[in-house]
């Protein structure tokens, strides 16, 4: 006990020393060229072009032929989802995909929002841009950039968009009405992949900042989870004067002295400001540690040799579906590992899930999306300058209880000193906008209300 108190005292002093040194820094904006070859002498075409998702008989026939030739290994008895995606349930997915799923219909769903492309730093950047159908008299819409992660895509936001752009017609107050921009990270979906090494979250942040300027927004709001959280954080570090507010549902806070308090155990947690809810979500330590180990194997592969596994996944739609949908199971709720079907249809429809898979399959971007891990983590954890820079823009955070790792308010506030809103969400996991659009929309609106009171 006395040893624990001594360790807590020493760690408390270290935390105080780090916090007292706090100073505002920003990242260097810089520039880049990620297209093939050298940057041309001519100025880049800055036009914004309408884009439409399309398909063809050839694309669908090729998919069906590949699906029909699938080979599955029988699962172990009573293994459920503990060994990964259960191939007995995968048979149901395959049958639905081949015989019921209507990709042409889903293409129409994708096209219900306006799509565009524009060239930035040599890459064709895809985004959807949804404006409010109506605005209260004398009001303007708040520009909100929403950024996805892996293995997600812009489609994750389709259910939350109307709650933000047209709240009155969805049972919400029109006090906050948004104009929503959802880009695809370069190398994901319809955004062109980099031809050069080194395209990381800071490069993506700079490109999305240029996108917002090109759309005419000098000031804007940001929202993100997974990689989107890091990209939005980097935008706030690059151009804080342009970011009016930052809302996150994931916080990457590894280079944060407060995270060390996690290792002191549950009994001393209260000394460092952990609430009862924090303690429930973080402990027992062994359970959280093993969850992180179980759920991070993919990260090691993608941070080291993404192209190898990418070759397999880009050649097999069934393999791609198993690889991605397993994340939609356990990252939504780790207890879904105990279910024969991984609990996938408890939160999502098969049409929704297969649409995500098709956006990776038809664009052939699984390999380039995985490279984003190597570019960001390949030099080692805590090796990037942005990890040591705090974010000095107003921030809101939604802590969903089934997120892979819970981030207590103390952890978040150390990285984001201007945290003005921290919410323990009632339910939900990693894919917040996709799984719980109403809850996430409510928290974004709550954050905006607090922000405007300042």
Swiss-Prot record:
GO-annotated biological processes: arachidonate metabolic process; catabolic process; epoxide metabolic process; response to toxic substance
Active site: 226, 373, 430
Annotated Pfam families: EHN
Catalytic class of the enzyme: hydrolase
Catalytic activities: cis-stilbene oxide + H2O = (1R,2R)-hydrobenzoin; 1-(4-methoxyphenyl)-N-methyl-N-[(3-methyloxetan-3-yl)methyl]methanamine + H2O = 2-{[(4-methoxybenzyl)(methyl)amino]methyl}-2-methylpropane-1,3-diol; 8,9-epoxy-(5Z,11Z,14Z)-eicosatrienoate + H2O = 8,9-dihydroxy-(5Z,11Z,14Z)-eicosatrienoate; 11,12-epoxy-(5Z,8Z,14Z)-eicosatrienoate + H2O = 11,12-dihydroxy-(5Z,8Z,14Z)-eicosatrienoate
Keywords noted in UniProt: Aromatic hydrocarbons catabolism, Detoxification, Endoplasmic reticulum, Hydrolase, Lipid metabolism, Membrane, Methylation, Microsome, Transmembrane, Transmembrane helix
Subcellular location: Microsome membrane; Endoplasmic reticulum membrane
Topological domain ranges for the Cytoplasmic compartment: 22-454
Cellular component aspect of the GO annotation: endoplasmic reticulum membrane
Its EC number(s): 3.3.2.9
Stretches that traverse the bilayer: 1-21
Superkingdom in the source lineage: Eukaryota
Mode of membrane association: Single-pass type III membrane protein
Modified residues (Dimethylated arginine): 294
Record text on activity regulation: Inhibited by 10-hydroxystearamide and methoxy-arachidonyl fluorophosphate.
A GO term, aspect molecular function: oxysterol binding
UniProt keyword Chaperone present: no
InterPro entries cross-referenced by the UniProt entry: AB_hydrolase_fold, Epox_hydrolase-like, Epoxide_hydro_N, Epoxide_hydrolase
Its job: Biotransformation enzyme that catalyzes the hydrolysis of arene and aliphatic epoxides to less reactive and more water soluble dihydrodiols by the trans addition of water. May play a role in the metabolism of endogenous lipids such as epoxide-containing fatty acids. Metabolizes the abundant endocannabinoid 2-arachidonoylglycerol (2-AG) to free arachidonic acid (AA) and glycerol. Binds 20(S)-hydroxycholesterol (20(S)-OHC).
Family label: Belongs to the peptidase S33 family.
UniProt protein name: Epoxide hydrolase 1
Annotated source species: Sus scrofa (Pig)
Species classification: Eukaryota, Metazoa, Chordata, Craniata, Vertebrata
